[in-house]
């Protein structure tokens, strides 16, 4: 599997932002040999970066696959997802701070994003998987739980395969400021599943947390 390289460093190009990151990569068929080769390539790529996951597109490979590794050898978890597609998302959302290898500035200054609390993912190699945040677990030792981290990372990496970056997931109410809404003004908001609701602006934040946006 050919990688994008940086001749100056004789290694993988860091902070890759290839043309593939802005386009959705379709599903393709893989032989067992091709799948194994791609998995090893992604493992090698992530080994050289201080990240928790990496998509094939970040390495300049136009294939729908990603590799995730979070935690230590004993209690951690790693996943290789082949042709992953998110088939279901919860209406509820939660806020998180994310950085991305392809956007260097966000490594030191993460962006505040909004993610779905629960997702279902269909893959060619592992079948259907479910990921859901664990708010109670997040309170233990003031650390983010394994369940919550995996829910975020999986969404992050699949986004890359759909041509989406964390800049597209930023939690912001900037649009409301531009329109100068009054607290009691009525606005129309759309849910992640397309449902439209009319609410007063003062209630908008409750809906933002569920993944709604103003239309």
Question: Predicted segment positions?
Answer:
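Positively charged
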Residues: 1-188, 192-198, 202-215
